[in-house]
Amino acid sequence: MSQERGTTLYYGWKIVAAILFTLTFSSGLSFYNHSIYLNALAATPAFNVASASIAVSLFFFSGGLAGLLVARWVQNYDPRYCLTGGAVISAGALSALSYVTTVPQLYVVYCIFGMGFSASSLIPATTIVARWFKRRRAMALSIASTGLSLGGVILTPLCVLLVEKLSFQTAAPIMGLIYLVGVIPVSWIWLRPSPESMGLRIDGDAVDEESVPTRDTAKQDKTRPSSSAPIEDGLSFR
């Protein structure tokens, strides 16, 4: 019998809710906010629409390259470290946008921003969810990924108000701080790297009675080499 069917809510669903929350902030303050940042920059004499558009392309290019390393890293280590590092990098790059004065500076900052976004968004998020679910993985991933859209719906209008009321130079560091607060605390308070880290099984399944060793099997185990337990597939999102 699985934990999902009992009276206790399977902790994996709390993981889904936490991932939805973090994706709301990481996507809302990066992916959906490019128009806000670039409009503010293009309004200054040092930049124009063409240079700002190239910066967005560099964001996705650098994020794609970084994603190759991020995907490999999160398979072997706790994804919460990746989310934390990515949030710090993204927040720093976002804050730095208010200080750029030349086109090369803009391109460098946007490349760094893209790498931070890659490390704090979909790749580590879906990896964690996939570790907690097998039978309902598609449902869990679809719910968690809703945060990508919520970021644009909720945070983008708020960021527009910040820029209008405070100016971009003042609002950018504030948005960077919001990025940190929206990702890091939730990652360490509610996220866990795997069910095994909490003494649970994937999907909340209970331990089979057949897997509990008896006296006879215990004696047999002493006379033969031990074998490693099978590792549950789910480290990568397919």
Annotate each predicted stretch with a short phrase.
Residues R192-D233:
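Flexible cytoplasmic inter-helical loops of multi-pass small-molecule transporters
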Residues T24, A93, P104-S120:
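Hydrophobic core of transmembrane alpha-helices in multi-pass small-molecule transporters
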Residues F59-G64, S149-G151:
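Short hydrophobic/small-residue motifs within alpha-helical transmembrane segments
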